[in-house]
Amino acid sequence: MLLDICSPIDVASWQDQVDAVVCTWQGGQESGFSVADVLSGKVNPSGKLPMTFQIKYGDAYADKFFPANVDDKTLGAMFMWGYNKDKAPKDRQPQANIDFTNYEEDIYVGYRYFDSFGKPVAYPFGFGLSYTTFGYDNLTCTVDGDLVTVKVDVKNTGKCAGRNVVELFVAAPNSKKLNKPEKELRNYAKTCLLQPGQTETVTMTVKAEDLASFNEKASAWKTDAGIYTFMICSSASDVEAQATAKVKAWTKKVHNVMKPNVKLNLLRR
């Protein structure tokens, strides 16, 4: 199955009926040559999904913020009334998800939602197959002031040459209690073309400020001091190795702008 698409689609009705899926995206006039190179084995794919493919459309939390149970004619008229209020019925009141939308996912967008709330997915963020396989070993985390340096050995354990994208996710201490995502992507790196049996040491760094989240009450970006878990992943759902490091606190004071003028029922863990 070749997917010439630009965003996630519903895969529940067919994914168990195909042997393999290649997401080609929309590569333009040269796309056919690239796909042929991958399918023939001339090129070993090493791409990773930049979004989550949910099983069904309605699995995404944002589904509830799109117009529903409205026929096309009425929906079209409603949108036109938004541009030309003189033609709208005099007693018409603004309707949610037609005239305005209050997005309530807050920080739980994409993999942060599916991961933090334990929702099954078809293909997780960061997922992508290769014609070879890779192993991970000797993960280390070294702290120097506000900088954490992460190193891991990546070995081609398969039978053909290939590149691998190493994804570094980080989990904050007490993430659920503090209403933070289960883990977040904080860096990534790609290996060179590794021959079968070849190993490369991949190095990535994370600053304390990279781990900050916004504290609304304090109007500040804050990183809490504590023990953070650094995870080497092959996708948001697949942790290959992990280690911990003690991170110092970090704060950057800012000021409120564009504060909502209505109370939002934001999603919380």
Name each model-derived stretch:
Residues K155-T157, A171, T205-E209, K248:
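Solvent-exposed residues in well-ordered beta-strands and their adjoining turns
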Residues K176-E216:
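Intrinsically disordered, low-complexity Pro/Gly/Ser/Thr-rich segments with frequent PxxP/GP/PP motifs
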